[in-house]
Swiss-Prot record:
It comes from Methylibium petroleiphilum (strain ATCC BAA-1232 / LMG 22953 / PM1). This is Elongation factor 4. It is found in: Cell inner membrane. The keyword Glycoprotein does not apply. Required for accurate and efficient protein synthesis under certain stress conditions. May act as a fidelity factor of the translation reaction, by catalyzing a one-codon backward translocation of tRNAs on improperly translocated ribosomes. Back-translocation proceeds from a post-translocation (POST) complex to a pre-translocation (PRE) complex, thus giving elongation factor G a second chance to translocate the tRNAs correctly. Binds to ribosomes in a GTP-dependent manner. GO terms for biological process: positive regulation of translation.
Length: 604
């Protein structure tokens, strides 16, 4: 075990993490030059295109160090985005060390800080690395000062490197060996392995990426998942180097993959512990306690996804099922809307996760989707003696006002990180979104603001606005804090007196008048004129708070009258009016797809 090092790379988006991983793999001869391509570990198209890492990947590499011994280095590539923070914490807990990669020309960013704190909490040894030293605007001294200031780890021995040109790679590998500890564990004890990630393969079923903590697992063992208490025969195991290589056994300290003929991903939950089913003469028996830190992931943001054509409902269901195979944090259940027909209510970890799922559905499965406004989960305390608490994740399911004692909304702690020139506009934005400032700290030229905010205010468009008021320099991350009672109301949109359920929104009372008016005005622009008058209203319960009319199109029925008696003209006009009235009773207004997106574009 002394010759094994497990490490991962922590970095903000675009600070060069995947390129650095490529160089390390190349230096250790993991792939031939022909197979080497940019961002080897990012296997999804969407990961390459957005330049982000979503799923964890690993590479087991052999490196001959300067002391002449050969070490096995396991590089575990972690996602860097705040939505995937649970996956990050699992990847990090499988490591003893982490390389903190900071772009020498940009300094530290919010997500780097968040992931770095996660690493320090898990007791991981962090080695700072300054990347992009080949750029003319690289400022290593400032970057070191920021690392010490913001994260509070010693950056004096930070390693300068450039993943692009390949300078400093050997120094990094030596630091991994000398500065990071070897894995701890009991090589002879009962086997325990932690699932870092799992995905679905069409040929072999679920593939689990695991870190062996104690003991040995051999091909042919019967293994038990501790969270779900299910047993499977172990069919194949091995390591990724970065291409998969089969082995006969995995020993404590190693990182590799297990294949056990599991059919659905729910059985192999990220963070779960794998051990043996029972004691046999040739093994050490099952472990009694699982590894700490496993938790079920709860979705934070919900939205409805509907096919544009009702006939494509089945294809959408199949597409979601396939996506769920590779994304255990996605939740969905069927739902029916009067306006949009059959579709699904989906739960996501956060906004980026939602965008990625939508994009993958449109891209890989060729789906045309209508998405409703994202909403969060509210806790509703019902009145009366029983006073039960229900969770409402869809605005149209909110009980009537009379039955509600109080509504609680999710509050999150938000860390905003930006150059000091933009503090003013960012604070104004945070206050508009009902943020309460908790802290403000200056680190050199950078400022870190800490706010408490309702999650509902963030899910709509906070991130886009933050980027625009700070010209793209601000970064943020957030974590759930608690549920808190709030004065929120449900605003319904009525068209000719009929509720359109997919357009309901839940907003704070102070903004309800304004939001209602804005949505109604927007609808008026979008809905085309009909043969009869259309009234668009916004209502809270039975109170109408805003109204717009769309005037009817009408034919000039008097065109054929030249002069003549007024009563003749009146007869024609009355006849037209009666016809319009009859039409209005039986006609229904077609709500175009843009209307559902319009809700998202209402400014505060």
């Amino acid at each position: 075990m002394d010759h094994i090092r497990n490490f991962s790379i922590i970095a903000h988006i675009d600070h060069g993490k995947s390129t650095l991983a490529d160089r390390i793999i190349q230096r250790c001869g993991g792939l031939s030059d022909r197979e080497m391509e940019a961002q080897v570990l990012d296997s999804m198209d969407i990961e390459r295109e957005r330049g982000i890492t979503i799923k964890a990947q690993t590479a087991a590499l052999n490196y001959k160090a300067r002391d002449g011994r050969v070490y096995q280095l396991n590089l575990i590539d972690t996602p860097g985005h705040v939505d995937f923070s649970y996956e990050v914490s699992r990847s990090l807990s499988a490591c003893e060390g982490a390389l903190l990669v900071v772009d020498a020309s940009q300094g530290v960013e919010a997500q780097t800080v968040a992931n770095c704190y996660t690493a320090l909490d898990l007791g991981v040894e962090v080695v700072p690395v300054l990347n992009k030293m080949d750029l003319p605007q690289a400022d290593p001294e400032n970057a070191k000062a920021e690392i010490e200031d913001v994260i509070g780890i010693d950056a004096e021995h930070a390693i300068p490197c450039s993943a692009k040109t390949g300078e400093g790679i050997d120094e990094i590998l030596e630091a991994v060996i000398t500065r990071m500890p070897a894995p701890r564990g009991q090589p002879d004890g009962p086997p325990r392995a932690m699932i870092i990630d799992s995905w679905f393969d069409n040929y072999v079923g679920v593939v689990m990426l695991v870190r062996m903590v104690d003991g040995v697992l051999r091909k042919g063992d019967r293994i038990r998942m501790m969270a779900t208490d299910t047993v499977y025969p172990l069919e194949q195991l091995g390591v990724f180097a970065p291409k998969s290589e089969s082995r006969e056994q995995l020993k404590a300290g190693e990182v590799g993959f297990l294949i056990a003929g599991i059919k659905e991903l729910q059985a192999a939950k990220v963070g779960d512990t794998i051990t043996l089913e029972k004691k046999l003469p040739n093994n050490a028996g099952p472990a009694s306690d699982p590894l700490p830190g496993f938790k079920e992931i709860q979705p934070q943001v919900f939205a409805g996804l509907y096919p544009t054509e009702a006939s494509e409902y089945d294809q959408l269901r199949d597409a979601l099922e396939k996506l769920k195979l590779n994304d255990s944090s996605l939740r969905y259940e069927p739902e029916v809307s009067q306006a949009l027909g059959f579709g699904f209510r989906c739960g996501f970890l956060g906004l980026l996760h939602m965008e990625i799922v939508q994009e993958r559905l449109e891209r890989e499965f060729d789906q045309d989707l209508i998405t409703t406004a994202p909403s969060v989960v509210y806790q509703v305390q019902l009145g009366g003696l029983a006073g039960e608490v229900i969770e409402v994740e869809n605005p149209s399911k909110m009980p009537e006002i009379g039955k509600i004692a109080e509504i609680r909304e999710p509050i999150v702690t938000v860390h905003l990180y930006m150059p000091q020139d933009y503090v003013g506009p960012v604070m104004t934005l945070a206050n508009q979104k009902r943020g309460v400032q908790l802290n403000m700290a200056y680190h050199g030229r950078q400022v870190m603001l800490t706010y408490e905010m309702p999650l509902a205010e963030i899910v709509l468009d906070f991130f886009d606005k933050l980027k625009s008021v700070s010209r793209g320099y601000a970064s943020m991350d957030y974590e759930f804090k608690e549920y808190r009672a709030a004065d929120v109301v449900k605003v319904d949109i009525l068209i000719n007196g009929d509720r359109v359920d997919a357009l309901s929104i839940i907003v704070h009372r102070s903004q309800s008048q304004y939001r209602g008016r804005a949505v109604v005005a927007k609808m008026r622009e979008i809905i085309s004129r009909q043969m009869y008058d259309v009234a668009i209203q916004a209502a809270i319960g039975a109170n109408i708070i805003a109204r717009e009319n769309i005037k009817a199109l009408r034919k000039n029925v008097l065109a054929k009258c030249y002069g003549g008696d007024i009563s003749r003209k009146r007869k024609l006009l009355e006849k037209q009016k009666a016809g319009k009235k009859r039409m209005k009773q039986i006609g229904s207004v077609e709500v175009p797809q843009e209307a559902f997106l319009a809700i998202l574009q209402v400014d505060d």
